[in-house]
Amino acid sequence: YIENAVDTTQLGGYSANFKRFTKYIKKGKKGYAKSAYSAYRERSLGLGAMGFHAYLQSRGIPFEGVFATGFNYKAFKHIKNKATSATKRLAEIRGECPDLYGNDRRNANLLAVAPNASSGIICSGTSPSIEPYRANAYTHKTLSGSYQVKNKFLEKVFKNKGLKVKELEDIWKDISGKDGSVQHLVILTDEEKEIF
């Protein structure tokens, strides 16, 4: 089940992003001289993951369950191993970063807990970073206005139960009135409540 969870064929490869990163370091503007120098010395990256909770909910896995813990460990160990392999290969090709000379690494830092909630919204409303969704329904305020956000995985569960449009509207209002919680809903099983 967890073995085939993520397509990892593209992880760890050398890409145009590394070339672009090097180009920006070399062309650092005068106002950024110290930052450019620091970046050149350590060549830190911030590889992270997003959509962790969305992934779990899409597969019907509770965030605090044993499957989530196992997948979390396995997925992030895989990311770390691929990032470490890639930085070592880059050190062979392009040389080590000056701050880590003798360690066979091109980059001092590889991983970061990122991105944030704004990135999650931009990426089709996925969950931010490795964090859980803050609620199943809430009002999102932006410069262009406010709109209600509904958990798309929970909405799918409701639709599979064959609810009518009016029933769905009432349920979403009820969820919004309970700060996005579904723990009070009798239509959901205990297992579904654990997921959402």
Q: Which residue ranges define each predicted feature?
A:
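Long, C-terminal-biased catalytic regions of enzyme "large/alpha" subunits
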Residues: 1-196
